[in-house]
Regions:
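A short, structured surface patch at a secondary-structure boundary
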Residues: 39-108, 203, 240, 248
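Proline-aspartate-enriched helix->loop->beta-strand connector
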Residues: 83-102, 117, 215-232
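His/Asp/Glu-enriched short active-site or ligand-binding loop at hydrolase and phosphoryl-transfer sites
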Residues: 64, 187-211, 231
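Short secondary-structure boundary segments
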Residues: 44, 101-102, 177, 207, ...
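A ligand-binding cleft/hinge motif common to bilobed small-molecule-binding domains
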Residues: 103-114, 226-243
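Extracytoplasmic substrate-binding proteins
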Residues: 23-24, 32-39, 96, 106-183, ...
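Bacterial N-terminal signal peptides
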Residues: 7-15
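Bacterial signal peptide processing site
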Residues: 18-22
Length: 293
């Protein structure tokens, strides 16, 4: 449950920061013209994946408890990204720290700044944000061309998924970020965008907020065609139990077996694997087309 709860808190953390600081470029807080970072600690798993995708895995000097790449397993863990070990962070002497843009991380950021580390706080809620953050990381690592290539590759793959799904029926989807209380992806989030790219329609695409909590009554009224529940290995949900759960049992998608558990580490991380997430979504939403390919 710890990893799944962390994923939700992380999404909400960035959402709040984005709402209050959307007009500020996160890159301005690290300064331009500095030497490429060589000793990096990323407290955000999606940013860590981006650093690896840019070819700079060898510059990472630590990982968090939620970094799943086996290539990083040998690195010391600083704990959870929102509450890392300050002692270990300072001991490792990073020249760049990628941190969560929230008030809870302020003490971490302040202390690291005293030691001369640059701090980068990306605010990624949309695919456009992801492109910007990828390019900003590329600039800080001296890998601008690699970043441009990565963005172009992701965009090309997403466009291929969109083209393949064009013209198909668009099932309505209830994407469950967190099960209890039900929390979903609102309009404008990258999940909302990926659902559209994959040929689906976010059943809460008109909800207020980026990651709103919703009532089961509201879900029942909207009767989504498909329910996708994100989960981690340590937070399994027995889908069969939904058939007797209050509210859930009233959904046709539950009664007719259109509930799918999806990997939170893939879908809830706005990083270089978003195209893979879109492809999997398209296969889930249009299984007959996937089988013919």
């Amino acid at each position: 449950v710890r990893a799944a709860r962390f994923a939700l808190i992380a999404l909400l953390t960035v959402a709040i920061a984005c709402q209050s600081e959307r007009d500020q470029s996160s890159a301005t807080r690290v300064g331009h013209g500095a030497k490429p970072a060589q000793r990096i600690i990323s407290l955000i798993p999606s940013a860590t994946e981006t650093i690896v995708a840019l070819g700079a895995a060898d510059r990472l000097v630590a990982r968090t408890a939620f970094d799943v790449d086996s290539a990083l397993a040998h690195l010391p863990s600083v704990g959870e990204g929102l509450t890392p070990s300050l002692e270990l962070l300072t001991t490792l002497q990073p020249d760049l720290v990628v941190a969560w843009p929230d008030n809870a991380s302020r003490s971490v950021i302040t202390r690291l700044e005293r030691f001369g580390a640059r701090i980068y706080t990306p605010q990624v809620q949309t695919l456009a944000d992801l492109r910007q953050a990828t390019r900003e990381l590329g600039d800080m690592l001296g890998l601008a061309e690699s970043a441009d290539s990565l963005v172009a590759s992701i965009d090309g793959e997403l466009q291929a998924v969109r083209a393949a799904a064009a013209g198909r029926e668009q099932p309505s989807v209830f994407y469950v970020v967190w099960y209890d209380p039900p929390t979903t992806a609102g309009p404008g989030t990258y999940i909302d965008e990926l659902l559209q790219i994959a040929g689906g329609r976010n059943v809460f695409g008109d909800a207020p907020g980026l990651w709103p909590q919703v009532s089961m009554e509201a879900v029942v009224r909207r009767q989504p065609d498909v329910v996708l529940i994100s989960q981690t290995e340590d937070s399994p949900i027995d889908v069969t139990n939904l058939r007797s759960a209050v509210g859930w049992r009233e959904l046709r998608a539950v009664k007719e077996g259109r509930v799918v558990q999806v990997e939170a580490d893939l879908y809830n991380r706005p990083g270089p694997r978003v195209a893979e997430a879109a492809r999997r979504l398209a296969a889930l939403l249009h299984p007959s087309h996937a089988e013919r390919r």
